[in-house]
Design a protein with these regions (language model features):
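Solvent-exposed loop segments that connect transmembrane elements
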Residues: 91-98, 135-151, 196-204, 248-293, ...
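Short acidic/polar hinge/loop motifs at secondary-structure boundaries
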Residues: 1-20
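Periplasmic-side early beta-strands and strand-to-turn transitions of outer-membrane beta-barrels
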Residues: 45-46, 54, 66, 70-154, ...
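Membrane-embedded beta-barrel scaffold of Gram-negative outer-membrane proteins
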Residues: 168-193, 400, 426-519, 524-526, ...
Length: 681
């Protein structure tokens, strides 16, 4: 349920199914871009044991062991354990230590029980712990298009423990199939960031969270091959997340982000002709650091009902129509407590022009307690319909047209609370200064009123819920396409054309002290996907896949810039995958396979302004596999031409020049190579 839990290792994969486009009708929330359905091998279907050893450059090594055994004809289990590490591919020039090294390990158990000819039960539990030393973000000059070095001084790391379990029950009736799926997930992670990614001591961020999530689905579906095929069910979930997200402003951060920024704003105010009588004011801060602690509890729960029906053989054989609908209700709440562990203290240096009299100089101390407490909530009801018409031409080809609606849940940006504290500092400081100036503290002389010295009033009227929240994203997807077997069992072709109309698309953006998710108005995307798979001989497999996407903003103005007709960030215009595999039998039990792959993608724009981008690039991968009855040997290499490219780009606040954000990139992995040895018994 949580995106921090998406990245983990699998062993004993039986199949991987990629479902494109919104899958919300059957699968619900956050599947508007598609779904990857991964199935693992059942110990009832395959038994045996194996040990896999892996070695590679950059000190890569790993070990994995698995065993699947039957205790009876109807009850079986599988157990596996794994460990993997590498030293990362880059170096932090400031610390002279590797950046991006990873250590991960875990285990999985699966129990499958065929109770009788009707009932089947399956339980799985998976644990994984990982420790990463990050992050390999290097400075980047957008003007010169030049990548600098990785150089920052504070800790950057990510540690995660995750446990996922599931219990499924299936009842096979003569007329229908009933399934019950129960899931539980526990996540405990801890992220540290040098948020400025520079050698200066500006500010750091920690985000530590614990999450418990449970889900339940009941579904009933018909058997395949009937004229009416249908599925319906109920779904519910509950998720409780506790997040600690402190931000620590170091000495440079206080000097640049509080003292200098406040003094610059005061100087700018004085230049306003309407405030010609405003006194000269500067401030000094006593704190050596300012620790802003943030504690956030975010419970969420939801329920859904869904159904889908397909009518086959409409008027003629091969013609079918599908209609589906899902209704989701979701409630999300946040209890937030953000506060400075110590008051912000300092003094203001005020010089008031008294006309014909000597200027009045005041050194006014201030003590500012900082904190924001409260609770916010959002409720959403979503409808996800699906309409599809399909025509099958025999058993070899079909064409289709469909329209589906998808959505992605809204949420809250924890990092926005640091921005709100900054606003509170400005408003509280000015209010405190004006209160004290109006009440004494000036050597016994009567203090002039605020209006007499031309001071403006400062009030903090920020709507917290509006500042920290982002809305759900919605889209309508339209697609036409087809699949054909052009030559019997030798050549397969797929082609699809799509158009996506998206509203309130969620994008990552720079906002004050970090990156946040925000809504971007309306976007439109259109394109195509085409693939060919050929087996000219039983030993040779060739495949080619190409995708084109044209995704642009139709309506998006962030209050400063209008991005209409700009390309949507992080959406590659072209994707290309070419692969070939040739298998040479050496004897009855031994094969030698040569595999070659080319993967290309780009152009990718990184920002809404389209002022930073990665051009099209391609990676060459290859492997040689010697496979036998008792052992396998695989020699592999990735990015064999050592292509240099940007895997990720982002911008963050430049503390030294607030008008010009800092840019950073994560470079792609260089050439890597290694060997896997698998022993089977």
């Amino acid at each position: 349920l949580d995106k921090s839990a998406f990245d983990f290792d699998f062993i004993d994969i039986a199949s991987i199914e990629v479902l494109k486009g919104p899958q919300g009708t059957l699968y619900g929330r956050n599947t508007m871009a598609g779904l990857v359905n991964i199935k693992t091998l059942s110990p009832l279907e395959k038994q045996g044991s194996k040990i896999k050893l892996s070695f590679g450059n950059y000190n890569l090594w790993g070990v994995a062991a698995t065993t699947s055994q039957k205790l009876t004809d109807d009850f079986a289990f599988s157990i596996n354990a794994r460990y993997r590490q590498d030293d990362g591919y880059f170096k932090n020039e400031y610390t002279r230590q590797n950046s991006g090294s990873t250590r991960s390990g875990g285990g999985r158990v699966q129990l499958d029980w065929r109770v009788n000819r009707h009932w089947k039960l399956s339980f799985s539990g998976d644990y994984e712990g990982s420790d990463q030393q990050g992050y390999p973000y290097a400075g980047y000059d957008k003007t010169l298009k030049k990548t600098g070095s990785i150089s920052y001084n504070d800790e950057a790391s990510y540690r995660r423990d995750i446990f996922t379990s599931g219990l499924s029950a299936q009842y096979l009736h003569d007329r229908f199939i009933f399934t019950s799926t129960t899931g539980y997930q526990f996540l405990d992670d801890d992220m540290h960031l040098d948020q400025d990614f520079t050698p200066r001591a500006i500010f750091t961020l920690q985000q530590k969270q614990k999450m418990h999530a449970v889900s339940q689905e009941f579904a009933v579906k018909s058997h395949k091959g009937k004229r009416w095929e249908w599925v319906g069910g109920l779904f519910g979930f509950y998720q409780q997340t506790h997040t600690d997200g402190p931000v620590d402003f170091r000495q440079d951060g206080i000097d640049l982000l509080i003292t200098k920024q406040t003094n610059d704003q005061l100087a700018a105010l004085k230049q306003n002709p309407a405030l010609a009588g405003m006194p000269d004011i500067t401030i000094d801060i006593d704190n050596r650091n300012l620790y802003i602690d943030g504690i956030y509890k975010t419970p969420a729960y939801g329920a859904a009902a869904f159904g889908q029906a397909t009518l086959n053989r409409i008027f003629i054989d091969g013609l079918s129509a599908t209609i589906g609908l899902r209704i989701d209700y979701e409630h999300t709440r946040i209890y937030h407590h953000t506060h400075a562990t110590e008051d912000l203290t300092g003094h203001a240096n005020v010089t008031i022009n008294m006309g014909n009299r000597p200027p009045m100089s005041i050194q006014q101390p201030f003590i500012l307690p900082l904190g924001i407490d409260g609770k916010e909530s959002m409720n959403t009801i979503e409808l996800s319909p699906k309409f599809e018409v399909k025509y099958a031409i025999g058993n070899k080809s079909f064409v289709y047209a469909l329209a589906t609606r998808g959505y992605r849940s809204g949420g809250y940006n924890f990092q926005m609370f640091s921005n709100l504290i900054q606003s509170q500092i400005r408003s509280s400081m000015m209010s405190e200064l004006m209160k004290n100036m109006g009440g004494g503290g000036n050597g016994g002389r009567p203090a002039p009123s605020r209006s007499a010295v031309g001071m403006p009033a400062f009030e903090n009227t920020t709507d917290v819920n509006q500042a920290i929240s982002y809305k759900p994203e919605h889209s309508w997807n339209y697609e036409i396409g087809g699949r054909s077997q052009l030559i019997d069992h030798r050549l397969f072709a797929d082609l699809s054309l799509f158009y996506i109309d998206c509203h309130d698309q969620q994008i990552a953006a720079v906002s004050g002290y970090g990156r946040v998710t925000k809504n971007s108005g309306r976007t439109a995307s259109y394109g195509l996907e085409a693939s060919l798979r050929a087996t000219p001989t039983n030993r040779l497999l060739l495949s080619a896949t190409y995708g084109y996407t044209h995704a642009t903003f139709q309506e998006y103005n962030d209050g400063k810039n209008d991005y209409k007709n700009n390309f949507v960030p992080f959406a590659p215009a072209h994707t290309l995958a070419l692969s070939g595999a040739y298998t040479l039998p050496l004897d009855k039990e031994t094969d030698l396979t040569f595999d070659l792959q080319y993967l290309g993608r780009g152009k990718i724009y990184w920002t809404e302004a389209n002022d930073a981008a990665q051009n099209f690039y391609g990676l060459v991968n290859a492997s040689i596999i010697l496979s036998g009855k008792y052992a396998d040997l695989k020699l592999w290499g990735k990015n064999l031409l050592n292509q240099h490219y940007q895997a990720f780009y982002f911008e963050t606040m430049n503390a030294e020049n607030l008008s010009m954000p800092n840019s950073f990139v994560q470079c792609g992995r260089p050439i890597t190579f290694g060997a896997d040895i698998t022993i089977k018994f």
